[in-house]
Amino acid sequence: MGKYDINFEGELVKVEVLDSAELISSWIIDRLKPKPQEEAAVVVRLQEEEPVVVGLDLHASKNKRGDCSANSLLVLCMNDAYCLVVQLKYVDNIPGNLKKFLSDRRICFVGVGLDWKLSRGVPPSHDPLVCRTVELSHLVARICKEPSYCNSDLKALAATYEVPYEPPASGGCCGGGGRRGRINYEARVFLKEEVKTLVRDAYVCYKIGQKSVEALYRDETTQEIAGIGRQ
């Protein structure tokens, strides 16, 4: 557990790493509660059915055979400057607010390789994670009307939307590695640099997804995000 202020190219992102169902539930409630100056904008968005964009990522360690184990960490980034890292291995139960949040059809969860990552499952003490996800490359390809983007990696997509992104120096089948070696995703406590690595992809996916959706509605396109997502 812990709170961290992470700097991404001059943007300060507040990250919380949590293993308490109560604290996770509070984080979700706080993020969905509009500030007074945002209330009018939120009402307009709901009336127009513009989805809330959330960057999502999952991390898993390797077992003794070298295969990916069940996901140990769930990462969510939203509201410009907030990320949550849920320690699935240690939380007693996944709170109802988080389950409801993940299944909310007004929320568009964007990321890379999400079908595969979700297929790794969660620790057996928890119910499977169910959420409506959109593969970021497919979202960008559809909005930009450029099919070739479907094969683009996160670095290329970030360049398209001018979002700063520097991939980890090393990686693995279960998630990115830190610059000083692989991260133990089952650790109780993480170094600040490790936390930055853990949330980097989810945060960049959020930024790109948000810009994509804003462009979609700015151009008054009638496509619905639901048509390219899944439940």
Give short role names for the model-derived ranges.
Residues 59-63:
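Short beta-turn/strand-loop junction motif enriched in small, turn-promoting residues
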